[in-house]
């Protein structure tokens, strides 16, 4: 199944591709510039190549030329005239397009998040919360913080300390988010979406 979903959320468009195709299938009907061909060939992982091609299919779904996408020296994706954020997890690839800064992240809900939780958040799940809910809650927190990291325009942002979800309500679809930094604090709004086995979150300026 190729193109999976298009969502319009306020002033943001989110496009999702469910990756089921091989590289050869993804190349069909997708002309690439010489620069894009060189970048594709430089990717030695088939998974990375498939993601690269899926992103360009999504740009075409958004009626944008694939060559409109470029990256800063820090590796952040850029478009002229609007903001873009890109994420992928297992067989899903997503892009978000907006006229204001936007961050997006998708993650598969896996038990290993419980081992990693103390490394990225001070929040602790209540002792009476069942394991499945804990996995989903920590995955939600991770996606919000990852989306915050992508939207951050401060230098040297610390993932644990500076990216915060100060009043986290597990599995609530809307969350407050905050970047604290010596150059100033900035508040954001977070939205989370729950698919079977996956959680993705989007962060934008308030």
Predicted regions and their residues:
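Core catalytic alpha/beta fold that binds nucleotide/phospho-ligands
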Residues: 1-206
């Amino acid at each position: 199944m190729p193109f999976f979903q298009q969502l319009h959320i306020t002033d943001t468009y989110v496009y999702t591709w469910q990756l089921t195709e091989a590289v050869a299938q993804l190349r069909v009907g997708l002309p690439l510039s010489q620069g894009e061909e060189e970048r594709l060939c430089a990717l030695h992982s088939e998974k990375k190549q498939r993601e690269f091609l899926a992103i360009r299919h999504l740009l075409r779904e958004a009626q944008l030329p694939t060559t409109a996408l470029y990256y800063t020296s820090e590796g952040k994706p850029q478009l002229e005239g609007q903001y873009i954020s890109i994420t992928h997890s297992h067989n899903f690839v997503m892009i978000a397009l907006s006229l204001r800064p936007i961050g997006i992240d998708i993650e598969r809900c896996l038990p290993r998040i419980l081992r990693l939780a103390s490394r990225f958040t001070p929040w602790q799940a209540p002792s009476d919360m069942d394991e499945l809910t804990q996995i989903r809650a920590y995955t939600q927190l991770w996606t919000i913080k990852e989306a915050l990291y992508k939207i951050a325009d401060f230098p040297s942002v610390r993932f644990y300390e500076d990216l915060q979800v100060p009043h986290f309500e597990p599995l609530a679809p809307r969350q407050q988010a905050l970047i604290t930094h010596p150059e100033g604090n900035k508040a954001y709004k977070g939205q989370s979406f729950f698919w079977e086995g996956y959680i993705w979150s989007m962060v934008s300026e308030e």
